[in-house]
Amino acid sequence: MKGPRSDNLAVSRAVGANVAALRRTRGISQRTLASTTEQTGKSVGFSTICRMEKAAAPGAAPVAVYVDDVVSLAAALGVTVQQLITTPNCNACMDSPPPGFACRTCGATA
């Protein structure tokens, strides 16, 4: 039995947007992030990361994200799964400034 289908895929879009923002905040490329996921035990490919990030853009076709990929990306980025699947309170630091820094926008510290 199939459940209702959502063409919006809001959580998958949030993951793509959050991965892109966290990656940029940390100054790492998509290829570097893909390589880092190999150390988590579940590799997420460069092309998968590209598709996730592109799908987060307004008007872009949605792309479903696998739970295992979300877990691996969260570990590689040093955040929780919850931080990847929800929209952050602060878009400047994604509610997770780098260690030793404070966000100038919201004041959050690591």
Specify the residue positions occupied by each region the protein language model found.
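Hydrophobic alpha-helical segments that drive targeting, anchoring, or assembly
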Residues: 11-13, 60-66, 81, 85
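Short, charged recognition helix plus adjacent turn
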Residues: 2, 9, 82-110
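Short, basic-rich loop-to-helix N-cap that marks the start of a DNA-contacting helix
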Residues: 43-47, 56-75
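Residues that mark the N-terminal boundary/hinge immediately upstream of a DNA-recognition element
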Residues: 18, 29, 66-69, 80
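Short alpha-helical DNA-recognition segment
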Residues: 27-58
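DNA major-groove recognition helix of helix-turn-helix
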Residues: 37, 53, 69, 77, ...
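A short, Lys/Arg-rich alpha-helix, primarily the initiator
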Residues: 1-35
